[in-house]
Design a protein with these regions (language model features):
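Conserved alpha-helix/loop element of class I SAM-dependent methyltransferases that forms part
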Residues: 138-157
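S-adenosyl-L-methionine
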Residues: 191-211
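Conserved SAM-binding motif I beta-strand of class I
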Residues: 178-183
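Conserved class I S-adenosyl-L-methionine
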Residues: 155-165
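Conserved SAM-binding loop of SAM-dependent methyltransferases across substrates and taxa
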Residues: 166-176
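N-terminal auxiliary segments of SAM/dcSAM-dependent transferases
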Residues: 26-119
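Catalytic activation segment of kinase domains across protein kinase-like and atypical kinase folds
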Residues: 1-39
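Class I SAM-dependent transferase core
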Residues: 116-139
Length: 211
C-alpha cells in the first residue's frame, strides 16, 4: 500500500510466552535461507521457493551456499548448525527446551543484523538497462513523449507495464495512474521498488513460467 508491503498474516501474532520460538525454523526457511542464497550464490535461487512453498529446506541451503558462510556467525548458526540439528534430531523425541526472553531477543537481534548485512552484488541483464541502452538522448526523450501522449489518451486508472526493467516508464505512467510494474529480473525489480513510488507495485514475473 502506497509503495510499502502490508503484513496480512495477522493470525501469526500471539501473546508472548516463555519458551522456544515456534516459528524459528519457518522464518529461517522462508526468509533467511532465500536471502542468503541470493546474496552469497545467485540471485535466481529465489525461484526455489516456487517448488518449496513451505520454505527452502535448510539442508539444501547449507549445501548450496559457499563454504565461506561458515565464517559468518549468523549464517553458521541459523543455517549450517540449524540444518545439522534438524538432521540429528529428526527421528528423536526432544524435550521442550527452556528459553528466556533475553535469549529469544538475542536470537531475533542476530537474525536482524545477519539479514541487514546480506547484499546482492550480482549484475543482471536488465538491471542497468537504461544506462547501457543504445538509445540516443533524443530518441529516449521522443519515446517518453510518445508514451506520455498515449497514456493521456487512454486515461486508465490502472496501467500494467510488462518488461518494466527498473521502472523508468512505470514512473511516467504513475503520474496519472496506478501501475503494476512487472519484470523477470529481480535486481531490476528491486531497483524499481527502492524508488518507493506509492503508485507503483513492482513484481518479479516470468510470463513464460508463471507461478
Amino acid at each position: 500500500y502506497n509503495g510499502k508491503p502490508i503484513l496480512i498474516d495477522t493470525t501469526s501474532f500471539e501473546m508472548y510466552q516463555n519458551g522456544p520460538w515456534k516459528a524459528y525454523r519457518q522464518f529461517c526457511e522462508h526468509f533467511l535461507a532465500p536471502l542468503a542464497l541470493m546474496s552469497k550464490k545467485d540471485v535466481r535461487l529465489f525461484q526455489l521457493l516456487l517448488s518449496n512453498i513451505d520454505g527452502i529446506p535448510l539442508d539444501i541451503a547449507a549445501e548450496i551456499v559457499p563454504k565461506s558462510t561458515f565464517t559468518n556467525f549468523g549464517l553458521a548458526a541459523h543455517i549450517h548448525a540449524h540444518a545439522k540439528a534438524q538432521k540429528h534430531y529428526e527421528d528423536k523425541k526432544v524435550k521442550k527446551q527452556k528459553l528466556g526472553k533475553m535469549q529469544l531477543l538475542g536470537i531475533v537481534e542476530n537474525l536482524k543484523s545477519t539479514i541487514k548485512n546480506l547484499k546482492i552484488k550480482q549484475e543482471t541483464e536488465w538491471a542497468d538497462y537504461y544506462n547501457d541502452t543504445n538509445y540516443s538522448d533524443i530518441a529516449e526523450k521522443d519515446k517518453q513523449i510518445i508514451v506520455k501522449n498515449f497514456l493521456k489518451k487512454c486515461s486508465s486508472e490502472i496501467v500494467v507495464d510488462l518488461g518494466a526493467n527498473d521502472g523508468k516508464f512505470s514512473n511516467i505512467a504513475a503520474e496519472n495512474s496506478y501501475v503494476v510494474s512487472m519484470d523477470i529480473d529481480p535486481i531490476a525489480v528491486n531497483t524499481n521498488y527502492l524508488k518507493h513510488n506509492p503508485k507503483i507495485i513492482p513484481i518479479v514475473t516470468n510470463f513464460a513460467n508463471p507461478s
